[in-house]
Regions:
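Membrane-helix boundary/interfacial segments in multi-pass membrane proteins
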Residues: 8-13, 63-73, 144-145, 255-273, ...
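Active-site lumenal/periplasmic loops and adjacent helix-entry segments of GT-C-fold
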Residues: 131-251, 255-267, 272, 276
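Short periplasmic/luminal acceptor-recognition loop of GT-C membrane glycosyltransferases, typified by
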Residues: 523-585, 603-620
Length: 641
């Protein structure tokens, strides 16, 4: 077992290393682009720069199926050069008085607030920080291994175990099912995490499940704060963020809503895209809207964000440009002169080039060839999608209450806020919602290509998270002067939080609050069983084939890809045809005792299975067929003779 003290030291070193490198590169980027160095923005932009740089370095290796070691060696060489250059340049600029560290700015701002005795800001800020820490603690301490981890975490594990950049979904998930790939993968996010694992000597499963949330969750709130600062008066910022994190945590318990993934799997690339990169993207676009001249620096940031979006998930190839288009269309409607509109056309076309190149590369992959077929899939009715997202179909009264609150908030924003804020919060909401009516957009994401409509659900709800905290934040500063309609709105907010935002029923799921059994984020028995088989077969040239029960199978390939499994996730492989029926039927026969012992032996032997792990109520007694090896709790390991 792992020494927890050593593990925590590694985690601490990893956090310091990641945050320091992000800050140094981000501060230099801000200085180079003539942006004022702010600590939070420097961290975010440094992170964006790192993953966009990694995508540029990794993509040629991925397309040629090169070696993982060569890829990370190349990246680390380039990145170390950039990091050292950034650090040296910052020291030189500081010596000349050109650069001022954001830490100095933070100290000055704290002194200013102390002099003003701005109790509201400090109170809401403290509440916000406590809630964020609670969010981080909840994610890092609770145990949940999602089905998607079987692929995403295993991809990083496989790269390290086999020094390979193989991305075939079926093969990575099991090691045996070499079926046509269903994911046109040109995104390097999992390899970026694998690179961090190698550098800081941590297992990829530990990096994904335990370490990444420690800085990705703060990055998420920083990116939203970056947007809020540009939309509202300074005194509302902390109150807004306090309510935002409260609503965000409530959102997390409904699988129908965007923030569910920020609680259950913040390490996934698609969650990084929607909760970190998209808010940053919106903030930069707001800067462009407000800037009358010298906008080149912001367009450069757009290019970095475009590449970073492609790095996190392949759907970034089309979701970021669509989000870009929605923001652009929303702003174009409010533009008062054609001259201002024409100034934007060329920069927009130039900055979208990385996404165009990415889309062309996707179409050249084997899985990408199926996009046209999948896009012909009949999409879901937009009315069904809309009603489902708001929970109106399950809880009509509460769902309608939440929807009314949302629209009333939009009306108040439209009446009381400035042009840019109206454009972003009201216009963006409308145009995002309208995209689901367009079958050209909803078709591909309602199909098998990207896993139902998950990505579109997240996309449509992006503006919602900005609108809902608006009224509560305003009400915090209007105590004693409330109008009747504001009291009603506050009541509706309570109803919405109590009902719609908890509509997924996740509070009844005990797994959500179960503590981690291991630092890998997978069941302890899975680690013990796998270690036993690996130790027993360490001198064998043959890679063992195993069959695990449902409770353990999802953790196996995350922990090691040096074992082959007949089944890792039913969703991927349940319908796979074998000489003995589908894999679903085989598993049912073995684990639900629908086979006799002799039949189970013949099937497993025919599938070349070396070990089968069962629950203790499934017993194989005939030593001619099975040899009992070891028992761990309620799981028993049998060798197939």
């Amino acid at each position: 077992m792992i020494d927890k003290g050593i593990f925590l030291i590694k985690v601490f070193v990893c956090l310091i290393g990641v945050l320091a490198s992000c800050y140094v590169t981000g501060a230099f980027l801000s200085c180079w682009l003539k942006l004022k160095d702010r600590f939070g923005r420097s961290l975010l932009f440094g992170f964006v720069f790192q993953i966009s740089l990694f995508e540029c370095v990794a993509l040629p290796f991925m397309l040629r199926k090169g070696s993982f070691s060569a890829m990370i060696t190349c990246y680390l060489a380039v990145f170390c050069f950039v990091l050292v250059l950034s650090f040296v340049m910052l020291l030189l600029l500081k010596k000349r008085g050109i650069y001022q560290s954001s830490l100095v700015c933070i100290r000055e701002e704290l002194q200013e607030r102390r002099q003003k005795k701005w109790f509201g800001v400090t109170f809401f800020g403290a509440a916000f920080l406590v809630l964020v820490l609670g969010h981080i603690a909840g994610v890092t301490l609770h145990q949940i291994t999602m089905g998607d981890d079987v692929y995403y975490v295993s991809l990083a594990t496989y790269a390290i175990d086999h020094n390979s950049l193989e991305t075939n979904t079926m093969f990575i998930s099991s090691g045996i099912l070499s079926l046509p790939d269903i994911r046109p993968n040109i995104s390097a996010w999992e390899y970026y995490v694998a690179c961090l694992s190698v550098v800081f000597h941590l297992h990829p499963a530990q990096m994904f499940h335990f370490v990444l949330p420690l800085f990705l969750i703060p990055f998420s709130y920083l990116s939203y704060y970056y947007v809020i600062k540009k939309l509202f008066d300074k005194k509302y910022h902390m109150a807004y963020m306090m309510w935002f994190v409260i609503l965000n945590l409530f959102f997390s318990f409904s699988a129908k809503l965007n923030s569910y993934n920020m609680f259950n799997c913040p390490w996934m690339g698609k969650v990084v895209l929607y909760n970190i990169l998209m808010p940053c993207f919106l903030a930069v676009c707001i800067d462009i809207m407000k800037a009358e001249k010298e906008t080149l620096k912001y367009w450069i940031c757009v290019v970095f964000l475009m590449i970073a979006g492609i790095c996190t998930t392949v759907v970034g190839v089309y979701m970021i440009p669509i989000y870009y288009a929605v923001i652009g269309i929303t702003y174009a409607v409010t533009i008062r002169s054609m001259k201002e509109f024409k100034k934007l056309i060329v920069p927009v076309l130039v900055t979208v080039i990385p996404a165009v190149i990415g889309l062309l590369l996707v179409l050249q992959t084997e899985a990408g060839q199926r996009i046209l077929e999948y896009s012909k899939t009949e999409p879901k009715r937009w009315t069904a999608v809309f009603l489902n997202y708001w929970g109106i179909d399950a809880k009509p009264v509460l769902g309608v209450a939440g929807l009314v609150l949302f629209f009333v908030s939009c009306v108040v924003i439209f009446r009381k806020e400035n042009r840019i804020t109206k454009t972003v919060l009201c216009g963006l909401t409308i145009f995002c919602a309208l995209t689901i009516v367009n079958p050209l957009f909803i078709g591909p994401v309602s199909s098998y290509l990207t896993g139902a409509d998950l990505y579109w659900r997240m996309f449509i709800l992006v503006p919602v998270v900005y609108v809902l905290p608006y009224l509560p934040a305003k009400l915090c500063f209007k105590a004693g002067t409330l109008h009747h309609y504001e009291i009603v709105i506050g009541f509706m907010l309570v109803v919405s939080v109590g009902g719609t935002l908890l509509g997924g029923g996740a509070f009844s799921d005990k797994k959500i609050f179960a503590p981690y059994e291991t630092t890998y984020g997978i069941p302890e028995k899975c680690v013990q069983v796998t270690d036993y088989i690996m130790k027993k077969e360490k001198n064998s040239d043959h890679e063992p084939v195993v069959l695990y029960p449902p409770a353990l199978r999802q953790g196996l390939r995350q922990y090691t890809t040096k074992l082959t499994t007949m089944m890792s996730r039913m969703y991927y492989q349940g319908d796979y045809e074998t000489p003995y029926g589908t894999m679903r039927e085989v598993c049912r026969g073995v684990f639900k005792k629908q086979y006799t012992e002799e039949q189970a032996y013949q099937v497993l032997k025919g599938l070349n299975v070396d070990y089968v792990v069962t629950r203790r109520y499934v017993k194989f007694r005939n030593p001619q067929y099975f040899t009992k090896c070891k028992r761990y709790g309620r799981f028993v390991i049998y060798h197939v003779n």
